[in-house]
Amino acid sequence: TILEFTMHNQVLNILLKYMVHMKTQQSFARNEGDKEIVERIQQWFDRFESALQVLLDEKSIHLEYDYKNYNFKIRQEGREPFEFSELSDGYSSVIYIVSDLILRMDKSWLLGEEISQYNAQGIVLIDELETHLHIELQKKILPFLTKFFPNIQFIVTTHSPYILNSISN
């Protein structure tokens, strides 16, 4: 629906602004000689990039920061760089879920506190997780979420046998 599309785009735009903010903070920290902050922010980006590689099932994927336009693109071997908004509905839905969780976990970082490594504890409810996901993505989504967010308990409703069979517990 139009409302879903608008919400997905809003969260994606917030995530991209957040990532630009992190790159800016990393540059300031580098200029100030704060190697610890530089490294921790780099670890955040490395982990996010690794998650994209797993999610998109493509090891050649890398994030590309366009500092002139304050934007991130996804670079894949043998393909022109593309924007997050160019992902299919299925991948966009997963990025929406991941972005929402990242932003909620990292909200404290925006307030000047510890940088999250996605290890916050909590419970997340997702209704009909299979919506917009093709079969291969349905098979990967729960293992991906539980690996990327190890301390989150996911409670999911689904009609998909692929999601149900994708995880042992």
Predicted regions, residues:
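Accessory N-terminal region flanking or inserted into the helicase ATPase core
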Residues: 37-48, 56-57, 71-85
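Coupling/switch segment of ABC-type P-loop NTPase heads
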Residues: 1-55
